[in-house]
Amino acid sequence: MRSLYLIVFIVISLVKASKSDDGFCSAPSIVESDEKTNPIYWKATNPTLSPSHLQDLPGFTRSVYKRDHALITPESHVYSPLPDWTNTLGAYLITPATGSHFVMYLAKMKEMSSSGLPPQDIERLIFVVEGAVTLTNTSSSSKKLTVDSYAYLPPNFHHSLDCVESATLVVFERRYEYLGSHTTELIVGSTDKQPLLETPGEVFELRKLLPMSVAYDFNIHTMDFQPGEFLNVKEVHYNQHGLLLLEGQGIYRLGDNWYPVQAGDVIWMAPFVPQWYAALGKTRSRYLLYKDVNRNPL
């Protein structure tokens, strides 16, 4: 009889342990419990810096830099005051030092902050990841940009970005490559207002934030993947890429390397590096992608 009581006690204890968060049968969820209550792109600005089992390794980082690509993860971002901006910290993530012809950086605007102007002949695109800013141009007209909004500023276009509280922007800049008499224009928009474009042979959802006319020498894409979806084409091309993963997680192939990636990660892709992505987890993956277009590579 005592043996029977002992067996029953052990079984009940195991069942309770398996149902508790501390039980040996439990496993952490890959989905945050408050995921649905947080604003869009929250995870990109509040990333998981390292898995719990690696928190005792102070020197651990997922960041990698190679000749033809780089993975720059949030624990590696180094912020300092942005030149010509007020009350703003920036982290330069991709620059010509890597071989790129463009710059990509994060700008963390604090209370009562404002932007500076880029150098002469430099075009700029800003995308709001967190908070809100006000864009003002030379005619004193202003537009409020909130999360998921963006603005393209042509070269030598006088403007100011002002922030009353706080905001996080991802900024792309490059020296404009003039083509005949073609000129670009100020563009203000939001991702949800852009149409879905056809992607023959692919399953992801594609939006382009800039016009596809020859005046524009780069474009910014958003690409959405549901869990389990992946690129069909294993891309190898002359275009350069700068990428910010806004949502989700997955595996990115760069060359012969396969990297686990998550929201908040930045990737630099040089020309002709083999590249491929597959979405994992339980939520949508969305990334923001820079791509040079409409110019002869010669």
UniProtKB/Swiss-Prot annotation:
It catalyses: (S)-2-ureidoglycine + H2O = (S)-ureidoglycolate + NH4(+). GO terms for molecular function: DNA-binding transcription factor activity; metal ion binding; ureidoglycine aminohydrolase activity. Substrate binds at E235, Q275, Y287, K291. Residues 222-288 form the Cupin type-2 domain. One of its GO terms (cellular component) is endoplasmic reticulum. Changing E235Q: No effect on manganese binding, but loss of activity. Coiled coil: none annotated. Changing Y287 to A/F: Loss of activity. Changing H237A: Loss of activity. Keywords: Endoplasmic reticulum, Hydrolase, Manganese, Metal-binding, Purine metabolism, Signal. Mn(2+) binds at E235, H237, H241, Q275. Changing Y252F: No effect on the affinity for the substrate, but decreased activity. Its cofactor is Mn(2+). InterPro entries: Cupin_2, RmlC-like_jellyroll, RmlC_Cupin_sf, UGHY, UGlyAH_cupin_C, UGlyAH_cupin_N. GO terms for biological process: allantoin catabolic process; purine nucleobase catabolic process; regulation of DNA-templated transcription; ureide catabolic process. Gene3D superfamilies: Jelly Rolls. Its EC number is 3.5.3.26. It is found in: Endoplasmic reticulum. Residues 1-20 form the signal peptide. Involved in the catabolism of purine nucleotides. Can use (S)-2-ureidoglycine as substrate, but not allantoate. The sequential activity of AAH, UGLYAH and UAH allows a complete purine breakdown without the intermediate generation of urea. Homooctamer. PANTHER family: (S)-UREIDOGLYCINE AMINOHYDROLASE. Belongs to the UGHY family. This is (S)-ureidoglycine aminohydrolase. It comes from Arabidopsis thaliana (Mouse-ear cress). The gene is UGLYAH.
